[in-house]
Amino acid sequence: VAETDGSETDDWIAACLDTADRCWLAMTAIVGELGDSAVNQRPPLEGANSAYAIVHHCVELSRWWLGTFGCGLGLPRDRPGEFRATGTTDELLERVGQVRADTVVWTRRMIADGIADRDARSTTASADLATVTPHWVVLHVIHELAQHLGQLELTVDVLGWAHE
């Protein structure tokens, strides 16, 4: 591996943070448009999640992968409960704002210091947690955010069809 002055890593981190933030901005726009009642509605499909639950799950997966696994913060997580979560748009938007800010700090810390808590367990990811790299963790979080943004967009579409 060629030696660098660190600018490539800084550019990579900036690109990752920008991509994650674009997902968060799209999610918050959708949540803001839905309001308190609609954000908690589930589409009429077996196993479907509400918009609130989808975004809440994204907050929690980011906190776990970056904060707990990556930085060793031991943040509590109830993964099964994430999909039953309900609440107001204001509280959800506040939590998203906090995790967006934390993501910057946690990502930079994890990339610089390495993964802090490989023994943490609260994921269903099919990855070898003993060998994943900090870069893999960042890309995994972005992948999950993008995937769940698509799920959120489809959820809103299905709710619209169900009410027409």
Where are these regions (language model features)?
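Short, contiguous alpha-helical
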Residues: 1-4, 13-28, 33-82, 122-164
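Acidic/histidine-rich alpha-helical segments that form the ligand environment
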Residues: 84-122, 133-146
